[in-house]
Amino acid sequence: MANDRKSIKFTDKKGIGKLKLKGTRDLHFYSFSQIKRVRLVRRASGVYVQFGIDVDRKENTEPSGNTIGLDVGLKEYYTDSNGVMVENPKFLLRSKKVLKRCQRRISRKVKGSKNRGKARQILGKRHLKISRQRKDHAIKLARCVVQSNDLIAVR
C-alpha cells in the first residue's frame, strides 16, 4: 500500500506491479497493522481488490426469548414452526428471457471474434446479477430470522 493510500503495489513476483485504487471505502480509517490480507478477484463485472481487515464487530441485541424451527424446501424458501411460509423468489426464472436473448446473441457470433467475447461478457454480467440477487435475498432473510429469535433449529 502506498503512503497516499490511493494505490497498491504487489511484490509477489507475479508481474502485477502498481495498481491505482478506485472506490468509496476510505482506507485512511484503518492502520496498516489492521489490514491482514489483500486479494485480487476477477468477476464478470471487472477486477476488484479485497482487503481483509481485523476489526472487532459488536452488536448489542436484547434477548427476545423466541425459538423457531425452520424447514428448508424447494417450493417454499423456508417454512417456520409458526406456520410462516416464505416463497422462493426464483430469480433465474424471472430473468430467463434476458438470458435466452444473450445466449442467442453469443450463438450468432463467430467463434474467437471480439464481438463474441463482448457478448460473453454481457452474459456473464447477467449471471453475476442473478447470483448477487440470490445471495442478497438469503443474507437479508437469515439476518431477519437470527435477530428476531434466540434459538433456531433447522431440519
Which functions belong to the PLM regions below?
Residues 1-41:
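Acidic carboxylate diad motif detector
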Residues 33-37, 43-155:
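Substrate-contacting helices/loops that form the catalytic groove of nucleic-acid
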